[in-house]
């Protein structure tokens, strides 16, 4: 056997293995970018030796065989995949090939849309009624998922409108929005169920359940993008026209579809979508570019496994493979011990990544991770990089287990894990230097006591030199003592002292937030302050009384109660008040006297606002008698959803809570 023949055999075997894991087992071991690289390598070798191309090569077909656990449906029209381009030069070369094949000097009109990261499906309608649905499978035969697809509310069971064909096979992508993905994983962590690595895996796992009742509980959705069978009817002769016709019949279509009359316009579309990608609310991994004219599509035809008239222009990979060199353990403000993987640096989505959070001991166990393992790293938007999975088939022999500490890595105190919690915590409290540093950084932060100029490096030095042990010690600092710190001159030192003096005048809500009580964020602190009015009333509240506050359940109430029951915490509060920390007396709002649709309502804000800041919105809502909470519960009356709203919106919809957008909020604020 020639060396190139051996290389081809090995590449095909590797690709088939990963196709099986991806299409059949829904457990991909490598990122898409690595699969694409292997496929390009195989194509290049086969181009050198066309005589060695075999009919069963991965370049000659679409995917892997379907599971036998489902009935099979044979696609009357094969479901082909698309070829990929990864940079502007490759796209321009594709554009030139199309123009050359058409023998045209005029620009082609391109229809550009999003490349959704979900599961490709075909849905067959007969006389407008949904009769069957199937996965892509190997492109020729897919799995019968009719019962599961019927549970997806975005997909109509019956088309409406005129001129519906006798048989119409719609093709599109089933996917899971980010909010739904977060909700599924949140529920799984709480109940000990399966946690999905990404929305695509969650969508695939949800759609391919043998029990459709499970699928029905998952917030899947669907966009259509093409047609297979068409009998007893007609469709427009442009791709965009067909999408608009689908929409008229009640089928969901993405609103990010654009006609481009030049290669430059296509590149502009690509860049704009890439910029907007973090705010879409669902995962995409590129854009799809198709010749708009169906007549020209027919002229161009197909290659073995893909059309010549379309291409997927993929974004830089959000997943890459690297090695775990070590695992270190960080201690946070509340004593939570978080394992952090130290990685062989790798570029992911344009950023050099050398660390990734491992969350907790359960996550390490779920991954089956060992030091030295080859892993897949994912970075999406502003999310902290995380380890998606271990590439077990490439595990080195010299890996070693990760041993979770039994004592705090900073102060040596015992660690504990409360039953029912995933987090392991240091029991050292403020004697732990790490907890002390993080607690003080939180205390002086902008949304807490807002001490201007008191940065992290100053706090680190104050703790390391034993100048500060509690928040009250900050207000005892002098310019002389601060001048002794690194890079701190007399003027800077005096500015910090002045900022500390100014910070003494605060609000009750900010003060509560600054104390760093577990599970008490800004909104909960504001709710506690508004409900109890005074520190004395809050300190003496029972757990039952605390639960009467919007956004406060048994867990938060217990944390608040335990915090004030601790003598050392009451002592620090006393010292802070003695140093002059103060806030205005509470203003009692009689909501019955306020003429506003928000009066007396518990309101939750989610997503980003464009017309005003979140703080301004909270202040205006509170002034109109609303109780602004930080999370959605059965006590919530109204959710205001801005752009890229997340899991709070999903929970509100699940509970049947009224949801309005920012425009409606602004209208009601002026009512």
UniProtKB/Swiss-Prot annotation:
GO CC terms of this entry: cytosol
GO biological process, alphabetically ordered: DNA repair; DNA replication
Chemical reaction(s) catalysed: NAD(+) + (deoxyribonucleotide)n-3'-hydroxyl + 5'-phospho-(deoxyribonucleotide)m = (deoxyribonucleotide)n+m + AMP + beta-nicotinamide D-nucleotide
Active site: 115 (n6-amp-lysine intermediate)
Encoding gene, per UniProt annotation: ligA
UniProt cross-references to InterPro entries, sorted A to Z: BRCT_dom, BRCT_dom_sf, DisA/LigA_HHH, DNA_ligase, DNA_ligase_AS, DNA_ligase_CS, DNAligase_adenylation, DNAligase_N
NCBIfam families noted in UniProt: dnlj (TIGR00575), PRK07956.1 (NF005932)
E.C. number: 6.5.1.2
Family: Belongs to the NAD-dependent DNA ligase family. LigA subfamily.
Residues binding NAD(+): 32-36, 81-82, 113, 136, 173, 290, 314
Residues involved in Zn(2+) binding: 408, 411, 426, 432
GO molecular function, one term: metal ion binding
The keyword Transcription belongs to this UniProt entry's keyword annotation: no
Keyword annotations: DNA damage, DNA repair, DNA replication, Ligase, Magnesium, Manganese, Metal-binding, NAD, Zinc
Essential cofactor(s): Mg(2+); Mn(2+)
Lineage top rank: taxon: Bacteria
Enzyme class: ligase
Ranges that cross the membrane: none
Source organism phylogeny: Bacteria, Pseudomonadati, Pseudomonadota, Gammaproteobacteria, Enterobacterales
Residue ranges occupied by any BRCT domain in the UniProt entry: 593-671
Function (record text): DNA ligase that catalyzes the formation of phosphodiester linkages between 5'-phosphoryl and 3'-hydroxyl groups in double-stranded DNA using NAD as a coenzyme and as the energy source for the reaction. It is essential for DNA replication and repair of damaged DNA.
Protein name: DNA ligase
